[in-house]
Amino acid sequence: MAHPAQLGFQDAASPIMEELMYFHDHTLMIVFLISSLVLYIISLMLTTELTHTSTMDAQEVETVWTILPAVILILIALPSLRILYMMDEITTPSLTLKTMGHQWYWSYEYTDYESLCFDSYMTPPLELDPGELRLLEVDNRVVLPTEMSIRMLISSEDVLHSWTVPSLGVKTDAIPGRLNQATLMTSRPGIYYGQCSEICGANHSFMPIVLELVPLKHFEEWLLSTL
């Protein structure tokens, strides 16, 4: 989870988030190189008199600055498209979890198990146990197995919401009347926090998300105790 004065991303806990971080670094390096080149040219223009005729009308220069931006855009677009397809592609999910946004809480339904559904409200600050996080804890956590492909079906009962868990690289809009899909897979057990990321009313800030990712054996034990 995030910590005070953090400048970078949260630690990646899913393959998709790892790819997103690599893509961020890749794009940032390209932006840094372009910015450095532009600043270098500006400094030359300010300190040097550019009066040579070849710099005023040069076919080669015009060709370069026409082709080079196209190449740079391709270098950015290709890995971006790859990640988009990774996020959207899911053929045989091990589990399907349906999420509905409400003002101002989330409801969850494990569609593979008929009777397993619950609402998840933020835990009021006065009811927190020692060690729990203010404005991030909920009364019912979502328990899921690790290292398994999980399909998220996300929608809303009232207004626009956005189901977001930064460590897992998941951010999907919850739109009334529309069912959006996301892929979820974690590489290690843990507790992961998220929040609604779409302004949805007065209590928008009080819609936390808590996922508890456990090994498959522990998930099966949780199912037996819950059903």
Swiss-Prot record:
Q: Which residue stretches are annotated as topological domain Mitochondrial intermembrane?
A: 1-14, 88-227
UniProt catalytic activity? 4 Fe(II)-[cytochrome c] + O2 + 8 H(+)(in) = 4 Fe(III)-[cytochrome c] + 2 H2O + 4 H(+)(out)
Enumerate the GO terms in the molecular function aspect: copper ion binding; cytochrome-c oxidase activity
- Subcellular location per the Swiss-Prot or TrEMBL entry: Mitochondrion inner membrane
User: Which coarse location class applies to the principal site listed for this UniProt protein?
Assistant: mitochondrion
For this protein, the record's SUPFAM superfamilies field holds: Cupredoxins, Cytochrome c oxidase subunit II-like, transmembrane region
Which positions bind Cu cation A1? H161, C196, C200, M207
Give the UniProt keywords, A-Z.
Copper, Electron transport, Magnesium, Membrane, Metal-binding, Mitochondrion, Mitochondrion inner membrane, Respiratory chain, Translocase, Transmembrane, Transmembrane helix, Transport
Quote the cofactor binding remark. Binds a dinuclear copper A center per subunit.
Q: Name the source's superkingdom.
A: Eukaryota
Q: Record keywords: Methyltransferase included?
A: no
Q: What class of enzyme is it?
A: translocase
GO cellular component terms, alphabetically, are: mitochondrial inner membrane; respiratory chain complex IV
Q: How does it sit in the membrane?
A: Multi-pass membrane protein
- Which GO terms are recorded in the biological process aspect for this UniProt protein? ATP synthesis coupled electron transport
- Its transmembrane ranges are 15-45, 60-87
InterPro entries cross-referenced by the UniProt entry: CcO_II (IPR045187), CcO_II-like_C (IPR002429), CcO_II_C (IPR034210), Copper_CuA (IPR001505), Cupredoxin (IPR008972), Cyt_c_oxidase_su2 (IPR014222), Cyt_c_oxidase_su2_TM_dom (IPR011759), Cyt_c_oxidase_su2_TM_sf (IPR036257)
Q: Which residues bind Cu cation A2?
A: C196, E198, C200, H204
Q: Quote the EC number.
A: 7.1.1.9
In this entry, the parts of the chain located on the Mitochondrial matrix side of the membrane are 46-59
Which cysteines are disulphide-bonded? none
How does this polypeptide assemble, per the annotation? Answer: Component of the cytochrome c oxidase (complex IV, CIV), a multisubunit enzyme composed of 14 subunits. The complex is composed of a catalytic core of 3 subunits MT-CO1, MT-CO2 and MT-CO3, encoded in the mitochondrial DNA, and 11 supernumerary subunits COX4I, COX5A, COX5B, COX6A, COX6B, COX6C, COX7A, COX7B, COX7C, COX8 and NDUFA4, which are encoded in the nuclear genome.
What function is annotated for this protein?
Component of the cytochrome c oxidase, the last enzyme in the mitochondrial electron transport chain which drives oxidative phosphorylation. The respiratory chain contains 3 multisubunit complexes succinate dehydrogenase (complex II, CII), ubiquinol-cytochrome c oxidoreductase (cytochrome b-c1 complex, complex III, CIII) and cytochrome c oxidase (complex IV, CIV), that cooperate to transfer electrons derived from NADH and succinate to molecular oxygen, creating an electrochemical gradient over the inner membrane that drives transmembrane transport and the ATP synthase.
The cross-references to PANTHER family, in alphabetical order and at most eight, read: CYTOCHROME C OXIDASE SUBUNIT 2, CYTOCHROME C OXIDASE, SUBUNIT II
Family statement: Belongs to the cytochrome c oxidase subunit 2 family.
Its name, as the record gives it, is Cytochrome c oxidase subunit 2
Q: Which organism is it from?
A: Microcebus tavaratra
- Source organism lineage? Eukaryota, Metazoa, Chordata, Craniata, Vertebrata
